[in-house]
């Protein structure tokens, strides 16, 4: 599978991402037209950092904007295709949501701390055009470095990571690390592009057969090569993998009603899966083994919920389990005038599973007063037809 891997060992900004993608071989004519269509001019230059060649892009514009609505209008009028535009609007939405949350204002009045001019918007449009032109099936990233210290923004002096950047990392559950220097390395624009584009964040480099390597140069002097590395290549196996934590505890004094509500609560708090298995405890007592699959950064929170709700005095945590998972995507099918999400699973282009969202099927069945199994059957049949047309 053709994949793009970002390696933000020195963070990421919009211009660094754009430069790295151009260096990888993105269609420069399409990228330039995307940037120019939002009212900017693109300069592409080659630079060297300690004998490492990199692409430094500079976006030139004397126009400015502040409102979300204005930015949306500019993007919609741009030269981006519908696919690239969808990603660009998603990036903008992520940034607006973060600024709104941090500053306590509504989204339309959110003030983008990087966007005194159109530079960041041009970086977004150019990066989306570049990623589309590279035509990859999967985008991965190593956990980004954010830097440290204090940074000067249009909101004043702020700690690193900047509040908007940190909110993006939090809301999208992106793992990150501090350092390696006391500068702002990961900007809100860079974080938002990664959040909207990356399918999986990793702690270390995956198994990949490298085709090309690109370097995007940052504008600041930070005492080390200020570069973002991007790798284009083939992932030799088609199952994805990630790192999860397994949390367990045994209980013998918890009712079925409490266990049912506990499962719902854990899933709402971010658990990936929860199972309850009947067991025979010491002294022949009947009980249950509660097992939770969790992301690493959610383990402490979910352990606290488990202990608080069951009264358990301790839990077992099995860290850093490697989970192999099939590729998954969500498509929508129409059933009797209603939209039903269908999860399609595949390995190496071979479809292995098509499952309609049960809760949606049940709701439609109740509205139309027909058996839920009929809704599931119709949605499944349509899902398989869609899946067959879209095999890579």
From Swiss-Prot:
This is Putative nickel insertion protein. NCBIfam families: nickel pincer cofactor biosynthesis protein LarC. Keywords: Nickel. GO terms for molecular function: lyase activity; nickel cation binding. It comes from Methanothrix thermoacetophila (strain DSM 6194 / JCM 14653 / NBRC 101360 / PT). Belongs to the LarC family. It comes from the Archaea. The lineage of its organism: Archaea, Methanobacteriati, Methanobacteriota, Stenosarchaea group, Methanomicrobia. InterPro entries: Ni_insertion. It holds the Pfam family Ni_insertion.
